[in-house]
Amino acid sequence: MPALATGSACDMGLYELLAALPAQLQPHVDSQEDLTFLWDVFGEKSLHSLVKIHEKLHCYEKQNPLPILHGAAALADDLTEELQNKLPNSEIRELLKLLSKPNVKALLSVHDTVAQKSYDPVLPPVPDDIDDEEDSVKIIRLVKNSEPLGATIKKDEQTGAITVARIMRGGAADRSGLIHVGDELREVNGIPVEDKRPEEIIKILSQSKGAITFKIIPSTKEETPSKEGKIFIKALFDYDPKEDKAIPCKEAGLSFRKGDILQIMSQDDVTWWQAKHEGDANPRAGLIPSKHFQERRLALRRPEIVVQPLKLSNTKSSGFRRSFRLSRKNKKINKSMYECKKSEQYDTADVPTYEEVTPYRRQIHDKYRLIVLVGPVGVGLNELKRKLLMSDAQHYGVIVPHTTRARRSQESDGVEYIFISKHLFETDVQINKFIEYGEYKNNYYGTSIDSVRSVLAKNKVCLLDVQPHTVKHLRTLEFKPYVIFIKPPSIERLRETRKNAKIISSRDDQGTAKPFTEEDFQEMIKSAQIMESQYGHLFDKIIINDDLTVAFNELKTTFDKLETDTHWVPVSWLHS
């Protein structure tokens, strides 16, 4: 029999190709995690051993050592019988002795087996009474690094079987395409799991490094391929899976903060969606509560929560005349503003969970987005607006409020106020022309929708400050508002920075400016906390007005980016 060839020629080929592949693929791999996965796969010792065997067999195959005959053992038997009929001599006796040795007989038998290619195992015949529906078993071997497997398991309460509950998108199990929801788990690395709890199996998986071998019974249920496009949502609440008692696997949960943009990877489960942070290079998804499930949980908790309303001051509202801070006591807020049906398709003020969003970038021909400023009395909204107008009066504009009071001698119609009759004001209220309105000393004051449109029509950025409960009615396709919450600093900083400042006190009948009091500071902090707690999910940005110049510069930078950069907006604004 010809010997196996040796030399460098047989050490080339597939083995060296596998060794060089990771370096060759590096420029084409998107993430470091994928590259690490490739290094782990191609660096497996068992894979290298198989490749070496393949190379040796390949070199042997090239020599094409065809057998001279396929029955060497039978030929030896015939020769022995023939020689026994001959007159014996020393050579015949030596040959008969050699052919009778067990080692020689075994060698000839192996030769015939290889020559006849009859070395494949012979399977036993299929029993006649076999059950056609008997479960088939599949052996799966996955190679993973330190990342989680990316699958959750559960125990069937009726059968006691351990099954795959879900496959996390982008995880090792998902990328392999070998494990599916509903598969029954029988063994992990040779360890039977029929009598184990899911927690014990998870511990086995977490302790396994490198390759993991599964013995499973495939699910008979066919999976429907997901046809979902890219869906992005804005989180309207904070979430920490470690504090969620309902989540099936805390390690598989995805934490997020209010305002984060998430990409939905799967909505197959009505209770738990799979998502990842937008822009995250990590392909693995995590579990988050679905919109329906979160709304239901919040609705069930609502009777136990005491929501503290914004404290209403008396009819002598501070800063009322110039900033249109309507009387908190007698103020009536328009509940059905123009186009509010569109904005209420997603009523975030009731149960804030998620809002579907899409990227938006203002085009040159588009009107500017409405800038809505929200903040407690005394925080500095008017001063910030004044500085913005002074910085560029041609670019920024403010609305002129309507009133039914008599015009004073030093006032001009359309400058300080738009003066209209009480009958016309009430008519406009009935046809939903006011964003918000109220009554002060038997006179009506209000901010009309037409005033906002008038500023935007002049190709200016409209600066509008309103009460926070009005914001949701402004969130329409027409205005595309960008809401900024001006937040006060700590009360210690207020005492330091506002000790010489003045406020129009609500306790002064004349509405004259007086120095801040300790009560004013406390009221400002308390109002800001309530605003952020109840309406924070509607705010696009929060700016702390600790130093007026710093706050103004941050505000100005925000506006500049708003006009040029891409931002996330409700999908209804672009697809209405």
Swiss-Prot record:
Residues 228-298 form the SH3 domain. GO terms for cellular component: adherens junction; bicellular tight junction; cell cortex; lateral plasma membrane; MPP7-DLG1-LIN7 complex. Residues 289-383 are annotated as: Phospho-regulated basic and hydrophobic (PRBH) motif. The modification Phosphoserine is found at S409. GO terms for molecular function: molecular adaptor activity; protein domain specific binding. It is found in: Membrane; Lateral cell membrane; Cell junction, Tight junction; Cell junction, Adherens junction. GO terms for biological process: bicellular tight junction assembly; positive regulation of protein-containing complex assembly; protein localization to adherens junction. Acts as an important adapter that promotes epithelial cell polarity and tight junction formation via its interaction with DLG1. Involved in the assembly of protein complexes at sites of cell-cell contact. The phospho-regulated basic and hydrophobic (PRBH) motif is sufficient and important for interaction with phospholipids permitting cortical localization. Phosphorylation of the PRBH motif by aPKC inhibits the association of the protein with the cortical membrane. This is MAGUK p55 subfamily member 7.
